[in-house]
Design a protein with these regions (language model features):
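Conserved active-site loop/cleft motifs that coordinate metal ions or position small ligands
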Residues: 44-46, 123, 151
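C-terminal beta-sandwich/jelly-roll accessory domains of carbohydrate-active enzymes
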Residues: 93-94, 99-106, 125-181
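Short beta-strand elements of extracellular/lumenal beta-sandwich folds
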Residues: 119-125
Length: 181
């Protein structure tokens, strides 16, 4: 017996299946930095939709599989590494002019100290769309700490999207990290 016969609401037309690009991933990353920075007041943040409907995970309507949208990764990393005490970094950065907000710093960042794991995670976004920006961090309060991993989410094309079988935007580990004592 067909399950839709008794429960026709289980089959619904595709609605609000927005496809997100790299630009959206940057915005989500910036939003999460703000939420973490204000975690003394914001106690819970969640996604209302997880699959297909304005969501970070999409499925093939023919049952062919699923894929992660560009916005999946900032949420994943914030969930995995954003546990602990939010640290308010002092940001000294180059700046650039915007049409609506005047001059803003190129770097937006927050750090999280996980005492249990003895880890500090720095979340940072380069807001300068024209130039690469070097991020220097001073971790003198965490003597003996070393870089365990440097993960980046990057693309030269702000409008690039992911699709089934085409993961154009995904995090990668980079070796472009140096540490001075």
């Amino acid at each position: 017996k067909d399950i839709t016969e008794n429960h026709p609401w289980q089959i619904a037309p595709p609605l609000l299946e927005d496809i997100y690009n790299f630009e959206d991933a940057l915005l989500v990353g910036l939003m999460l930095i703000v939420l973490i920075r204000h975690s003394d007041r914001v106690k819970v943040a969640c996604l209302a939709q997880l699959i297909n409907v304005i969501a970070p995970i999409m499925t093939d309507p023919n049952g062919g599989g699923s894929w992660k949208q560009t916005i999946f990764y900032p949420f994943m990393h914030a969930s995995k590494y954003g546990r602990g005490v939010a640290l308010q970094p002092v940001i000294s950065s180059t700046e650039h002019e915007t049409s609506g907000h005047g001059s803003i710093t190129d770097i937006e960042a927050v750090a999280v100290y996980n005492e249990e794991k003895e880890e500090v995670t720095v979340f940072a976004v380069n807001r300068n769309l024209k130039e690469d920006v070097v991020l220097n961090t001073d971790v003198r309060s965490f003597e003996g700490y070393r870089v365990a991993e440097h993960i980046v989410l990057e693309s030269d094309d702000l409008k690039v999207v992911n699709a089934f079988g085409q993961e154009n935007v995904k995090p990668k580990t980079t070796q472009q990290t140096t540490m001075d004592n």
